[in-house]
Amino acid sequence: MEQGYGGYGAWSAGPTNTQGAYGTGVASWQGYENYNYYGAQNTSVTTGASYSYGPASWETTKASDSLGAGGPAVHMASYGPEPCTDNSDSLIAKINQRLDMMSKEGGRGGSSGGGEGMQDRESSFRFQSYESYDSRSCLPEHHPYRPSYSYDYDFDPMPDRNGGFSSQYGDCRDPARERGSLDGFMRGRGQGQGQGRFQDRSNPSTFMRSDPFMPPSASSEPLSAPWPELNYVGGRGLGGPSPSRPPPSLFSQSMAPDFGVMGMQGAGGYDNSVPYGCGRSQTRMRDRPRRRGFDRCGPDGMGRKRKQLQIYDEPDAKLARADSEGDFSENDDGAADFRSGDEEFRGEDEFFDPGRQRGEKDDEDDEVKKRREKQRRRDRMRDRAADRIQFACSVCKFRSFEDEEIQKHLQSKFHKETLRFISTKLPDKTVEFLQEYIVNRNKKIEKRRQELMEKESTKPKPDPFKGIGQEHFFKKIEAAHCLACDMLIPAQHQLLQRHLHSVDHNHNRRLAAEQFKKTSLHVARSVLNNRHIVKMLEKYLKGEDPFTSEAVDPEIEGDDTLGGEKEETPEEVAAEVLAEVITAAVRAVDGEGAPAPEGSDTPPEGQGPVDTAEATHSPHSEQLVEVETPCGAAPEKGDANAEAGGETTEAAGEEQEVVAKTDGAVDGTVRGAAPAPPVTETKAEQTEAEPKDVTPTE
């Protein structure tokens, strides 16, 4: 028997049941021959002291026979599913080094197994009564908090990942063991920290206590022996090694794992393989997140930690790695642990960055709104220009660029049913006028289209497929658009028939037909409320032909019809009245030489229609009236007014040709008014006051 390392005794590697004396006659250790610290032995050696340690085998009957209250021997559970042939001295030296790590912490020896002189708190980790694997059979009433479920395992906890250690979850811990453990855990007592770590992290109630890194009690941990305190995997690492490989912790090169804040290990305790690590199931390890510090317990942080945990756990559950690989993975896991924290805080900084730039985003939103408004105006003008050359049935909301299609529609059953529905709400004569009006309007649109085609026939049409190559896999096809279902269907007979006979289409088309009928009545009334069409209707009811009269420009009539689909706003009505008043005033000034209403001056002699010929055909010619107003916001309102009442402005195009002649008169008229009233109010005042002084010229 060789001398112990540092006074603790050495471990003999003899082929037989050798004993290593602990200190000077303290107790003999057994069962570590041939690196077989699981080997069951049947020899009890007693030294000079009264502390004798006999073995307790896996068979509970033997352990029960030799265990009793006040017995001379305190049994130690020795476990050995298979012998190991590695008999090297390096293993013994490593074991002694780990014993020395414990001696540096406490420096005190001696403990009482039978109740004599518990002088050392630290030694309580090493010398206590050890239960057999089945704690119920050998110690029926040993501890009131002993777990109530069995450990049915045959030396290999692989079928159940928890092995014999599932009792650690939520069990009561022994205060005697916990009292002297905090300082050892804070100092890094070898690789035994993994035991306390798994206990604390598996039980959330123990995390924020004053002793957060206590190892579990003997009752909740039937395999807690002095050996588990020396290896990194903890007491649960001895549950039953896999026959395929030795325990990795015995060959670990790192004597103390890395520590983070408050003594928490940065190295990955969860990275160990299951039978040697903590024995916890992978699902339980994922269910509870890691806690790297007291300031990282938020739900978001937990979610990130759990994801990080899965990355490093799953390979260990599937692959049997070498010991050196296990060590490197522990360090790597710790590095990844802190890297994940940095990424977490970086993500939080990025999350709060938008809050710091809200002012800039508000400005960007304003710019985006302005751009969108401009785009809407351009789209409106483009649509208006397209409507001038597009065939349309206003009451049915049918539009087409093909003459044949509009003719078919006017003779279709749908169009006739729509007019029949309108005739139930409006007089028959009015409905007939609507039909005649729609037909005549489309004739005028056809003439306009022919003129435009002659002018623009030389211009090549843009190809929408220009720049689209075969790599985009585009193909030009014909398709049908189902307005009721809002769906595009390729123009193939099978697909079209399938859609036409589908239940959804038949349901949607009935709803659409009802909706179109209701809308058609509203549109018809709006069209008939237009002042130009009202005059035409009066002539039609008198028996005259309103469509042959050239009093209204055909182009304007078409625009009026399009505008009739929506009711006129008060601004549009005011603009129309103002245009009429100005026209009457101009005629009075030019024809009779009378002063313009409200003291307006005569126009300059040099000013005439030629000078403003270009402005005559402008769609915003109404701005000529309002541009001289002293109010700074008047021109902008004039723009909006001109857009809102653009159709009416075009309707009064002939009358407004003479507006340019009386710029001075209009200027005087507006300047004589009250300063800076709203544009509509100014128009209303002029509407009320001016007709009194106007001499009718008709």
From Swiss-Prot:
There is a cross-link at K318 (Glycyl lysine isopeptide (Lys-Gly) (interchain with G-Cter in SUMO2)). Residues 1-213 are annotated as: Interaction with DPY30. GO terms for biological process: innate immune response; protein transport. Residues 388-451 are annotated as: Involved in chromatin-binding. InterPro entries: AKAP95 (IPR007071), ZF_C2H2_AKAP95 (IPR034736). It is found in: Nucleus matrix; Nucleus, Nucleolus; Cytoplasm. GO terms for molecular function: DNA binding; protein kinase A regulatory subunit binding; zinc ion binding. Residues 572-589 are annotated as: RII-binding. Residues 126-151 are annotated as: Nuclear matrix targeting site. A motif (Bipartite nuclear localization signal) lies at residues 290-307. A motif (Nuclear localization signal) lies at residues 369-378. This is A-kinase anchor protein 8. It comes from Canis lupus familiaris (Dog).
